[in-house]
């Protein structure tokens, strides 16, 4: 029986552990340099665009043009170290076309903690803006919330669900944040992402169908059409 004598000469084990330690240190240095010189480590903003593209391909049926446009827009925005304006995505479509699912995937693959990230802000009209009579109060609160959170983290995501149910005029307070200016209210907002979700029926009623034509709805959109607009 052959007896290994490694117990008498532990240098191999020590050198192996030293190699692991050096490799870990090198990996840490690379990550540190990336955080120092890149914009990927702001807050918990860690974009995983290949993972997003994979999940969209595997779990979102149809919507080929929409998927391609989402990925293309995000790549261009994330890779730009100094964007001139925030990324604005408008997702609209019929019920069941994947609007909410796409928005959750975006948060999941853009931030380390996904929708639980303190820098992902999800607004629901039923929860946050239930009383149209308080629109002016909501405007002040929304402006203060967006401004304060962008001051804390420029890489913030603001998700507005069911846009068709929001009090009229509420979104006017966001217009200064969506343009190409450098600073708004003393806040640099150009790295922010805004996502607006709207039901297609509301879009049709607000701008598609002539007034007074009840029931004049468009045919259901084909799966290949992209219910998405970017700014």
UniProtKB/Swiss-Prot annotation:
What's the domain of life for this entry?
Answer: Eukaryota
Q: Glycosylated where?
A: 149
GO molecular function terms attached to this record: ATP binding; ATP hydrolysis activity; hormone activity; identical protein binding
User: Which residues does the propeptide include?
Assistant: 28-189
Residue sites binding ATP per the record: 93-100
GO CC annotation: endoplasmic reticulum lumen; extracellular region
The residues forming the signal peptide are 1-27
Q: Which residues lie within the region annotated Partial activation of MRGPRA1? A: 192-211
Q: Does the keyword Phosphoprotein apply?
A: no
Q: Which Pfam families match?
A: Torsin (PF06309)
Give the family per the record: Belongs to the ClpA/ClpB family. Torsin subfamily.
**What is known about what this protein does?**
Salusin may be a endocrine and/or paracrine factor able to increase intracellular calcium concentrations and induce cell mitogenesis. Salusin may also be a potent hypotensive peptide.
Name under which the protein is recorded: Prosalusin
The organism is Mus musculus (Mouse)
Taxonomy of the source species: Eukaryota, Metazoa, Chordata, Craniata, Vertebrata
């Amino acid at each position: 029986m052959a007896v290994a004598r490694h117990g008498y000469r532990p240098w191999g084990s020590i050198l192996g552990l030293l190699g692991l330690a050096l490799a870990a240190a090198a990996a840490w240095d690379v990550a540190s340099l990336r955080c120092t010189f890149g914009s990927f480590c702001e807050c918990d903003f860690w974009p995983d665009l290949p993972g997003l593209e994979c999940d969209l391909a595997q779990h979102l049926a149809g919507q080929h043009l929409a998927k391609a446009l989402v990925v293309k827009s995000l790549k261009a925005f994330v890779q730009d170290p100094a964007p001139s304006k925030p990324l604005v995505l408008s997702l609209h479509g019929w019920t069941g076309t994947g609007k909410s699912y796409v928005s959750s995937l975006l948060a999941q693959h853009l931030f380390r903690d996904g929708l639980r990230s303190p820098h992902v802000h999800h607004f629901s009209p039923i929860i946050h803006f239930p009383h149209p009579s308080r629109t002016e109060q909501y405007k002040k609160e929304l402006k203060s919330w967006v401004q304060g959170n962008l001051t804390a983290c420029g890489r913030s995501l603001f998700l507005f669900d069911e846009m068709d149910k929001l009090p009229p005029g509420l979104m006017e307070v966001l217009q200064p944040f969506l343009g190409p200016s450098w600073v708004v209210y003393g806040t640099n907002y150009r790295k922010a992402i805004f996502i607006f979700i709207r039901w297609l029926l509301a879009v049709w009623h607000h701008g598609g169908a002539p007034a007074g034509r009840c029931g004049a709805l468009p045919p259901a959109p084909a799966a290949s059409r992209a219910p998405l607009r970017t700014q």
